């Protein structure tokens, strides 16, 4: 394979990308990953100060990143966001990264109706609706990609809350459905399911005992880093991954494949 062709297979240069929740944790790493490959990115966040701080840093790095203040859990704001993206990118979008997510970890019997609505609107409805809104833009690009940021909690039972887990499982199924339904439109869809990653969200939600137990179950014996997730997200959107669609790929240090035979190293 010629060098130029090889390089093109592993390129995201000039690709247009929308990343929701791109100012923190995995979302922040995804923005920087794609920007490092030469993509043109628009991201959104609720906190205007944090967004502007990130945009300023990215500008200094020479990244092509713009941003909107937006609560993507709200339908009118999602519609406004997609109008902005459509105008900015000339009615086309190459890549949609549905990264927005939130968690309230409780026993099932302690969840309220408001907790249920919160998780559904933030984790599931936002991704579902944004995918609907993005469809004509992705189709117009001729080679669209959708990534749903899921969780291993949507693959196996995890003590992080049944509603959160249900929304992540739904995202995995949504990736499968859209992969089949929209394949004829030139759109691929995949889900990426991390385990506990070293992010501010993980620090805020999980106590030390929980973290210790999780690490003890991981054959690699540590938490993952955001960049170890963003690298997979970038790969899935490259021409090199053109035959991968409808998949849920775990990024978990081996956690989901660890049965009873493995004993963590002391």
Curated annotation (Swiss-Prot):
CDD domains attached to this UniProt entry: TR_SDR_c
Binding residues annotated for substrate, in chain numbering: 151
EC number per UniProt: 1.1.1.-
Positions bound to NADP(+): 18-42
Annotated Pfam families: adh_short_C2 (PF13561)
A Gene Ontology molecular function term of the record: oxidoreductase activity
Family: Belongs to the short-chain dehydrogenases/reductases (SDR) family. SDR65C subfamily.
UniProt xrefs under PANTHER family: 3-OXOACYL-[ACYL-CARRIER-PROTEIN] REDUCTASE, TROPINONE REDUCTASE
Designated name of the protein: Tropinone reductase homolog At1g07440
Native species: Arabidopsis thaliana (Mouse-ear cress)
């Amino acid at each position: 394979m010629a060098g130029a062709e090889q390089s093109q297979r592993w390129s995201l240069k000039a690709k247009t990308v929308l990343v929701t929740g791109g100012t923190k944790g995995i979302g922040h790493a995804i923005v920087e990953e794609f920007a490092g490959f030469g993509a043109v990115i628009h991201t959104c966040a609720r906190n205007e100060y944090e967004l502007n701080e990130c945009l300023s840093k990215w500008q200094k790095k020479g990244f092509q990143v713009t941003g909107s203040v937006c609560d993507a859990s709200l339908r009118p704001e999602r519609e406004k966001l997609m109008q902005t993206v459509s105008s900015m990118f000339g009615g086309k979008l190459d890549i949609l990264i549905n990264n927005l997510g939130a968690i309230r970890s409780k026993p099932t019997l302690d969840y309220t109706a408001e907790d249920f609505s919160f998780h559904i609107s933030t984790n599931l409805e936002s991704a579902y609706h944004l995918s609907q809104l993005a469809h004509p833009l992705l189709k117009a690009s001729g080679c669209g990609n959708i990534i749903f940021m899921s969780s291993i909690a949507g693959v196996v039972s995890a003590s992080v809350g049944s509603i959160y887990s249900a929304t992540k499982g739904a995202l995995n199924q949504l990736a499968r459905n859209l992969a089949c339904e929209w394949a004829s439109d030139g759109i691929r869809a995949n889900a990426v399911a991390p385990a506990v990653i070293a992010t501010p969200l993980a620090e805020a939600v999980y106590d030390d005992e929980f973290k210790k137990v999780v690490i003890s179950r991981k054959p690699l014996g540590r938490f993952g880093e955001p960049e170890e997730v963003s690298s997979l997200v970038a790969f899935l959107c490259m021409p090199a991954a053109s035959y991968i669609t409808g998949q849920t790929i775990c990024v978990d240090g081996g956690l989901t494949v660890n049965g009873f035979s493995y004993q963590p190293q002391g």
